[in-house]
Amino acid sequence: MKIINITYSIIFAGLVFLATACSDVVTYNDGYDDQLASYGPPSVSRITTAKDTATIITESSLAEMITLHGNNLTDVTSIFINDVEVDLSTIYAVRTRLTLPVPRILPMEADNKIKVTTKLGTVSVPLTVNVPPLALSGLDNEYAAVGDTVNVNGANFDLYEIVDGKGKVYFGDIEAKIDTTTAEYVAVIVPQGATQGDRIHVVGPLADMYAPGRYMDNRGLFQDIDHYQGWTGQNWFTDVSRPDDPKPCSGLYTRINRTLGPWEWFDFIASWYPVFDGTDCFDNPEKYDYKFEVLTLIPLKTKGIGLIFQTGYYWEPGKIVEFNTNGKWKTITVPLEVVMNGMKETNLPHENGHVGFQINIAGGESETIDISFDNFRITPKD
């Protein structure tokens, strides 16, 4: 009997505990508003960027994330910026806030408005979208051979539909086949019949312009290695007789593959050159570019390349990040006024109408390099 009483006592205590525990259950507010429903036509009080929701904007750029602030901004059925429709899968909407990307598409007609339509109405507010131009910076290798693929570099090629079937790229009057298009470049195959000095002409549905520079530009060519008459560096010239030599871009080139110690100075080009173009390039360096082709088989890290018209200018492509062309020839363009460092032709020492020039590698830490050069030239800016 005593055992039965103890059992009843335990059961009763358990029931009391459960009753007490149930009394501690939290009751949530059934009136919680998740802001996913709208109750009237949409309204917009201001527009900001998605990053800075405190600063009102009236202008935006393609691909920028923006936020509309207002009321009843859910249940969206369409959004247009100018005449470009926004993909609704890219938006985030609650009743008082609507975040979306400005589509990276050129409008055919611009009314400078954003129009939002929901199940309960439509609102239209002013918004100017700044459209970037097609920008061309030139061929990534001006000495690419016929049949090779070369990039016309720049910006917004995809935006302006410089693509196969819609856009065209010409070498002079000869059309090149478009291989690949990205925002930063259009890759084309150098066509049969492309001629030294050809301008590169880019045409699209909404663009028609010429790239700076020319194909195999030999204007102002003062050192192409094939006709070198200097006093040092000939032992680094190659005719691709070694099995590991890269394919040349035009005849002989100089290839330096060795280890240089810290701050070791190494000259590989040194000569006197005729002062061409009536010295105009030195009197007006802002009108000219200094160009050459370069190829690396090992990334260049800390060494600088001296391009010296008695001015001490150093080209240091690896100063911030490693410079590497990945075994491909690339054209390097440096404004001549940067190379000249503000000096004028009259400051340069002459010898029988010639100007001294040398190229060296120096500075930095101990480094193994494998770098090739060709076609040093000073060309007018197009």
Provide a role label for each language-model segment:
Residues 23-74, 120-164, 196, 207-233:
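Beta-strand/beta-sandwich contexts
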Residues 241-271:
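Short carbohydrate-recognition loop motifs
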Residues 270, 276-277, 283-342, 369:
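Extracellular ligand-binding interfaces
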Residues 17-21:
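C-terminal motif of bacterial Sec signal peptides marking the signal peptidase cleavage site
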Residues 108-119, 196-206, 357-359:
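Short, aromatic- and glycine-rich surface loops/edge beta-strands on solvent-exposed regions
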Residues 143, 212-224, 364-382:
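Extracellular polysaccharide-targeting segments
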Residues 292, 334-370, 375-376:
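Extracellular beta-strand ligand-recognition surfaces/modules
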